[in-house]
Structures are given as C-alpha cells and as structure tokens.
Amino acid sequence: MSVDSPQPVPSHPLPTARPEVPTPGTAAGAGRLLSRPVLAWASWDWGSAAFNAVMTTFVFTVYLTTDAFGGEDRASVVLGWGLATAGVLIAFLAPVTGQRSDNGGRRKLWLGVNSLLVAVLTGLCFFVFPRPEFLFLGVALIALANVFFEFAGVNYNAMLTQISTPRSIGRISGFGWAMGYVGGIVALVLVLVAFVEPIFTWFGSDTTDSLNIRLVAVFSALWFLAFAVPVMFAVPEVPRKAKSAQLGFFASYGLLFRRVKAIYRTSPHTIFFLLASAVFRDGLAAVFTFGGIIAAGTFGFTLSEVIVFAIAGNLIAAVGAVGGGFLDDRAGPKRVIVISLIGLLIAGSAVLILGPGTHEFLGFIWTGDTTFWVFGLMLTLFVGPAQASSRAYLARLAPAGQEGELFGLYATTGRAVSFLAPALFATSITIFGEQRYGIIGILVVLLAGLLVLLPVKPPAKVAPAVAPSY
C-alpha cells in the first residue's frame, strides 16, 4: 500500500496524539526545560555518552580495529558483523520487553536493570588485551552491551512523554540529546588527560598491554552507572495494568501483533514512520559507530587526535540538537529530519570523494586532515537534530500508557534493518579493498532512509494512534 493511500478526512483539524494534560505517572513539573525531572532524565543521556562516545565510537572500537587485533580491515569487518548480530537480537526482543515494562508498571525498574548490565559488560572490556585472539571477546562484549543499551533506551525514550507536553516535547528531546553530547565532551576530556595523553603519571597511564585503554572501559562503566541513578528517583513509575501484566512472554507477541494491526488501522502513518526511521536511524548510528574508525584508519588520526576531534564534534552536535529541538517545536519534526539527512549526505559524500589525499575543491587546497575536520564536523552537526526529532515525532503519536511498547517497536524496526549499515560498510571494504570505501555503505543507507521518509505525513497531519489495552 502506498503511504499516500486515501484516509478519511476529518471535518476539523486532526488533534495531537497526546492531550496536554498529565497522564498517570507523569512527573511533577513536566514540560519545563530545567525542571528536576527533566534534568534527572537528561542525566541518563549525559552518562550514556561514556558508552556511546567513548566505548563504541571514539576510543574502544578504535582500539579494537588497530593492527594489534589482526589489522584494521579484518577487525572492522568482524566488528561490523558483530554489531549486525546484536541488531537481530534487539529486533526480536525490544518491543515485547517494552510492552511488558509498560504493562507491569516496571518501566523504571527495567531501565535500571538494563543500565546496570551495560555497565557490567563495559567494565569487562578491561580484560580485552591487545592481541588477535582477544578480538572476538572485545566485539562480543561491545555487541552484547549494545543489546542491553537498546533495551534500556526503550524505557528511557518512553519516559519522554512523562516529562514533557506537546508544546515542549521537541526541545526536551533535543535537550536530552545535547546533554548526551556535552557529557561525551566531559568524558572524552577526562579520558584524554587521564589515560591517553596523561598530564600526570599514575598507574592508569601505563601503556603496557594497553592498560591505559583497558582502564578507560572501567572508567566508562562507572561514569554511566553514576549518572543513570538520578532518573530512578525523579520520574515516577507508570501504573501497572493488571490484566495485560499477567500475559506470558510468548503471549505478549500476540498482544503486540494485535496492537500493531490496530495502530495501522487508526494511524497508518505511525507505522510508515517506524519503517522510514528504521532505515535512516541505522545510517545515523553508523556515522558515530564508524566515524572514529575511519578517522584513524583512513585519515591517519592518532588516538589523541580522534579524541580531540570527538570533543569538537560532540560540541557541534550538542548545538545542532538544541537548535533542532526548538525548530522541531515550530516547524515540525519531519522538516528537521529531512534537512538533516540532506546535510549528512552532502558532508559524507565530500569525505568520501576528497579522501585522505590533497585536492583542490571550491578554490581551496584540501588536505586529508582539513577534509575530515570540516566535513566530519558537518556530519556531527546534522546527526543530533535527526536523532532528537525522530524520537519526538514518535512520542507525539504514542498511545497514552503504551509508550514503552511503541518505542520497543521503534527499536525493533530500527534493529530489523540494523544489519544494513554495518553489513554494507563491511561489504564495501571487502569489494574495494580499502576502509575508506566503507563510507559508501553508510551513504546508501542514509539516502534510502530519506527517500522512504519523504512520502510520510508529519505528525500534525496524522490521526492519533489507538490500540487495545490488552
């Protein structure tokens, strides 16, 4: 069916999916940007940067793809397939785990449990020594941590409707992403001055067997855990739904399918958006997952230079997320996402075409370093708004009390195709024999996501989703 299939036209403007009144479990002060619940909620994003920025983007995966683990090309391929495998697990399990935390009144509990598991797996990366036989252990730990991180993210994203109103949901979502980027800056600075290029000598600066880099994993685990705590006290738990909470695990899939059918009948563009965002979000994730790897392997950045770039990139991304959040509340999330995807395609193409050599472009002489700094930072500028507006788009359409399940579907549809970017990244390297060409795989996914999104209606023109409670 086309996404533009005729739908019944109401005689009055379509209402927003969520009324501007508190729903059960909504935190006191919801909607105010600097309120206690919003700050506590955003603290989780701040802490999660230790996993996103330090572990999976700019430090630990860069470490995993060095020559110590058998060569950058081989290690990049193993990492790509490892993350693709993690995506399959998330695709099958995320919506039901979200549904069960909604129905059982355990959204906050499972956010805490999954966050703890991420911290433990991150800490275990300390035992990944710089030898080829440890590559699969390192990839397995990072991949499994990604699984539980996504499960935690389902519950975390679902809380957005508890701390915001329809008029503030875009800027609060953007504020959360910005807090994550700024948290990433602080974490990366600490990693740089304490472990990678220490300003004083201590046992954590010892480079024997890459002890300093392995200790970064311990630091990241503790950082994430510490900043994940505030949300557990500031945002109330959602109420338990007695009847649907009694469903067994496999019976939950039956309820899930009934709800998806009901949402499709009442608000088909909600489903269309889930499918479109699945594609482009996979490309967004790949920009960060493989950005540091490309900086080091293709453009010759040292680990210290990668971290300095990451600090600058997170600052630019934070500005983009905040600006995009305010634009979201005024112009709508779809416009923000489309503009961001076009910007990403332009910047990514420039990185690919210009590459690490010296070229003349737009009347200037571009070296590899200049190319990556200019267009790499341009990439980070557009990632934040696309991520924040995608979350805000779905939160506007979520049926009250079923946010966790819908964000579970959000994770599942994303992870159902999450093998695309890692697989195309790995395949492009295999075909062309050079890490640089992995960028082609990422660009293909971003372009496909943009094309699938264009026919999807913005939230203001979409009927609210209605789904059965059990």
Tell me the role of every PLM-derived stretch.
Residues 21-39, 236-275, 470:
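Juxtamembrane intracellular "pre-TM" segments in multi-pass secondary transporters
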Residues 121, 133-152, 279, 362-385:
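Hydrophobic core of transmembrane alpha-helices in multi-pass small-molecule transporters
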Residues 101-117, 329-344:
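Cytoplasmic membrane-interface "Motif A"-like loop-to-helix N-cap segments
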Residues 53-76, 289-309:
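Short amphipathic helix-loop junctions that connect adjacent transmembrane helices
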Residues 126, 223-234, 354, 439-470:
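Multi-pass alpha-helical transporter architecture, strongest
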Residues 72-75, 195-222, 366-367, 427-446:
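A membrane-interface helix-boundary motif in multi-pass transporters
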Residues 115-132, 342-365:
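C-terminal ends and interior cores of transmembrane alpha-helices
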Residues 92-106, 319-333, 429:
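Helix-to-loop junctions at the C-terminal end of transmembrane segments
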